Amino acid sequence: IETNVIVGRSITIDELMEDGYKAVFVGSGAGLPRFLNIPGENHLGVYSANEFLTRVNLMKGYKFPECPTPVKVGKKVAVVGAGNVAMDAARTAKRLGAEEVYIVYRRSEEEAPARLEELHHAKEEGIIFKFLNNPAAIKADENGWVSSMEVIKQELGEPDASGRRSP
């Protein structure tokens, strides 16, 4: 058994089979977080969805401030993206007491990569969708905590390599 292998970089599936393995299990999980490289993404209160969900689910980060790795959920929360992990993060923030939770996505609902059930459940829980908006900057208050997000309104163009229309 070989674990923690980056298939495609450190070894290929064909190479594993040539080495005598009879089967290959690929567990991709949520993958590595992607940041936007916009001003303000290092302000206090900005988390990758993976970090946010890990702190909440595995480290009891919702027990703010008792937890050694707490997560402070504000009254208003913005989650960037519209995949399954984004839906999980948005719904979790809502359940932890955020009054308004926004999904900010640069494409339209039709291009959202989340499963339809995930979108449906997020809407049922009161998540607010801001489609065709792309984050441009994250602003902070005088203490360094996130206070707002600037977005740029988008229009869809031609489909990209994924088949979804690009902003």
Predicted regions, residues:
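Glycine-rich dinucleotide-binding loop and its adjacent helix/turn
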Residues: 1, 6, 33-96
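A Rossmann-like FAD-binding core segment of flavoenzymes
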Residues: 1-15, 19-34, 60-67, 95-167
